[in-house]
């Protein structure tokens, strides 16, 4: 008992404010703090899916499918020290679709490359997400009228986030990842293209 009293005596107001802030964050995620004496400050009870989504959103493993200049100018620049995509936990680019959570389609998708895009998407484990990066991946870009260009990767696979630009700036790429993170944490707020 003496230790608890000394602990509260040290700074009771700060501890209660911290507790209230923790409860507020947990309620925002849909969880409720467990009311079991002092354990309530460290344990939360809530939907398992919410906690899994929170973990997924903070440890995405992207797989780049660079088809044109967007892969070099936007994606690689976002991985450089100036923008540092690593600070968000997305720096480890995967070469295998079986190890990836996010497929980044960067550049023009031709009809010849389309089966490979679909095959890589199908090889990814669930849950899987797709980011279309650049005008060409989103809508075909300046090559949309060509006989050999697919007018947007969303004609082949469902896309979760669109990052416009030719090529998108690295900060736009980071913003796209943040939007995907928000979508994963709150799936009931934002629906996928195939769920509308």
From Swiss-Prot:
Entry keywords, A to Z: 4Fe-4S, Cell membrane, Iron, Iron-sulfur, Membrane, Metal-binding, NAD, Quinone, Translocase, Transport
Could you tell me which Gene3D superfamilies the record lists for this protein?
3.40.50.12280
> What kind of membrane protein is this, topologically?
Peripheral membrane protein
Q: What is its EC number?
A: 7.1.1.-
> By its UniProt entry, which Pfam families does this protein fall under?
Oxidored_q6
Which coenzymes or cofactors are required? [4Fe-4S] cluster
Annotated GO biological processes are:
aerobic respiration; electron transport coupled proton transport
Spell out the NCBIfam families in the cross-references.
Answer: nuoB_fam, PRK06411.1
Described function: NDH-1 shuttles electrons from NADH, via FMN and iron-sulfur (Fe-S) centers, to quinones in the respiratory chain. The immediate electron acceptor for the enzyme in this species is believed to be a menaquinone. Couples the redox reaction to proton translocation (for every two electrons transferred, four hydrogen ions are translocated across the cytoplasmic membrane), and thus conserves the redox energy in a proton gradient.
Q: What is this protein called?
A: NADH-quinone oxidoreductase subunit B
| Source organism per UniProt | Desulforamulus reducens (strain ATCC BAA-1160 / DSM 100696 / MI-1)
Q: Source organism lineage?
A: Bacteria, Bacillati, Bacillota, Clostridia, Eubacteriales
């Amino acid at each position: 008992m003496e230790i608890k009293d000394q602990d509260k005596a040290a700074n009771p107001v700060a501890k209660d404010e911290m507790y209230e802030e923790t409860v507020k964050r947990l309620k925002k995620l849909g969880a409720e703090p467990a009311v079991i004496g002092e354990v309530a400050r460290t344990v939360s009870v809530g939907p398992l899916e919410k906690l899994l989504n929170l973990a997924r959103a903070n440890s995405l493993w992207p797989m780049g499918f660079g088809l044109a200049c967007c892969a070099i100018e936007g994606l690689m620049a976002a991985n450089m020290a100036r923008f540092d995509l690593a600070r968000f936990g997305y720096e480890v680019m995967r070469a295998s679709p079986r190890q990836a959570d996010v497929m980044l389609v960067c550049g023009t998708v031709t009809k010849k490359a389309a089966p490979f895009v679909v095959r890589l998407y199908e090889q990814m484990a669930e849950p899987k997400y797709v980011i279309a990066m650049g005008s060409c991946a989103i809508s075909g870009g300046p090559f949309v009228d060509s006989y050999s260009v697919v007018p947007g990767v969303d004609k082949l696979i469902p896309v979760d986030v669109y990052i416009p630009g030719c090529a998108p700036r690295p900060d736009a790429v980071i913003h796209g990842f943040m939007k995907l993170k928000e979508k994963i944490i709150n799936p009931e707020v934002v629906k996928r293209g195939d769920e509308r």
